[in-house]
Amino acid sequence: NILNVLIMIWFVNLYVKIVTRVIKLKHSDDEEFQLKFISSGMLSTSELSLLQAKKEIALYGQRTQRMFGMVKDLIHEKEGSETFSKIYSRIEKYEKISDRMELEIAAYLNQVADGRLSYDGKLQVSAMLTMTTEIESIGDSCFHLARTVIRKQEAKVEFNEGIEKDIDLMFKLVSEALDNMNLILDKNDMAESDLNKSYNKEMEINN
């Protein structure tokens, strides 16, 4: 046992380097524009193409939620610090990725719609286009929030404790709404309970 511990200690630095490199590569890959499911073009049937588009939209939703988390981090980071600048740069990059993903997914769906598609299939395309537009709108809102934080910094505005608590509460509620959105996007069939949960969360946010 002592020998095993000594060996582990000897290799600790190597483990750290490997893990750090893997995390860094994963982090870097995620922040480059790339479509995971529809990059290879149309599949043999429209139904399969729609399935791939659905997966891509689900991934789009996850990326947008990650962007929202960055905005929360930005608000709690010391303004003007190096970390603050890095987070803002990441948000800016994600916003550009979000815009490109919307365009690419929409172009793919329109291509699917031009093919042989059933009535139900056309309804699915219409719904997916709406989803894509709404997710892109969330990305835009995240970027606008980040810009507001920058303007707050430039104007040297300070929030009191009450305002900060209200902001944290709003972030919590919206984060829960995004959690539910992504759960729905991952499902093949949406239940009425999912819709009710989303509706109730929206009411909670608005109130």
Which positions does each model-derived feature cover?
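Cytosolic, long alpha-helical scaffolding segments
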Residues: I2-N207
